[in-house]
Amino acid sequence: MPSISVRRLFDDNQYKLQLAWAAGNSGADNRIGVEADKPVLALVGHLNFIHPNQIQVVGLAESEYLNRLESGETGYQFGDLFDISMSLVIVANGLPVSPGLRDYCHKNDIPLLTSKLESPYLMDVLRIYLQRTLAASSVKHGVFLDVFEIGVLITGHSGLGKSELALELISRGHSLIADDAVELFRIGPETLEGRCSPMLRDFLEVRGLGILNIRHIFGETSIRPKKILQLIINLVEADDEYMKQLDRLSIRTETESILNVNVRSVTLPVAVGRNLAVLVEAAVRNYILQLRGKDSTREFLERHQTQLKENEQHNENRPD
C-alpha cells in the first residue's frame, strides 16, 4: 500500500497550512498510508478515540475535552484513550497545546503539529493532498501531451516515431508533459492524472538529435506539469495488407483499461506518406466533438440510410 512520511507531509504543506512543530520530532518518519478497509478520505478526521484516524485533528470542541481530560474531570488519562498507533496529531485554530498532550506525544514519538487555520479547512486540504499523493499508480511507456487542452498519451512499439511526432506537435503549439515513462495516478473513481518524474521533466529524446530540453527550446508554455488522461493514441506499423483489412467506417468505440479506469483509445496506422501530426490533431478534434454529442461516422451513416430510403420510395412511385 502507498504511504508517505510525516516529514514529507510537513515539508509539502508547511507554508500552505501554516504548520509548526510542537513535539514528537523523533516520530517524523512515521508512515501515513492507505489501509485495505479504509479509503484515503478516512485518514484524516477530528479527534476520535473509538475509531482513531491516522491523522487526528484537534479543533475547538476537542481542545475543550482534552482540557477536561487533563484536569481529571472525566476520570480518564491520556494513555487510557489515545491510540499510540496514530501517525500524527494536529492542533488547529491556533489553539494552545495542552501540556498533557505535548508530554504524551513526546513520550510515544507521535508528531504533534500546530496550525492557525480552522480545522474543517485544514482537513479538506489534507484529504485532497493525501488523495493525490497516495493514489494508485502505474507507469506507461509513451509520450504524454496536452493537445487542444486534452491529455493525450501516444503509445506504440519503439522505432515508430513517437518522439518525432511529439516534437512536431510541440512545434505546432501543443505541450509536453512526459516522455518515455509516464506516471499515471488514479485520483478519482474514473480519473487518471498523468505526470512526469522529476528526473525526466522537460526532456524529450529524439533519435539522431539526442536529448532535447523542450522548455529551453520552445519556451515555458511548451511544458505542462500534469494533465488528466482522456485519450490514448496507439501507433501501429501498417503494411499494404493491414491497410486493406482496416475497417474504414468503424463505429465501435475502443477503450483501454488502466488502473480499472477505461480510457478512450484510437489506433493510427503508421505508413509512408501519412502526416501523423495532422492525424493526431484531427483525432483529438473528433474526440472533442464526440464529447459534445457529435459523431461524424454516425452522421454519415444516418445520411446514407436516409438517401437509400428516399431512392427506394422514388423507385416505388415511378410508373412502370
From Swiss-Prot:
Region span, Important for the catalytic mechanism of both phosphorylation and dephosphorylation: 204-213
Binding site for Mg(2+): 163, 205
Residues binding ATP: 156-163
NCBIfam families, alphabetized: hpr-ser
PANTHER family: HPR KINASE_PHOSPHORYLASE (PTHR30305:SF1), PROTEIN YJDM-RELATED (PTHR30305)
Function in brief: Catalyzes the ATP- as well as the pyrophosphate-dependent phosphorylation of a specific serine residue in HPr, a phosphocarrier protein of the phosphoenolpyruvate-dependent sugar phosphotransferase system (PTS). HprK/P also catalyzes the pyrophosphate-producing, inorganic phosphate-dependent dephosphorylation (phosphorolysis) of seryl-phosphorylated HPr (P-Ser-HPr).
Name under which the protein is recorded: HPr kinase/phosphorylase
Lineage: Bacteria, Pseudomonadati, Pseudomonadota, Betaproteobacteria, Neisseriales
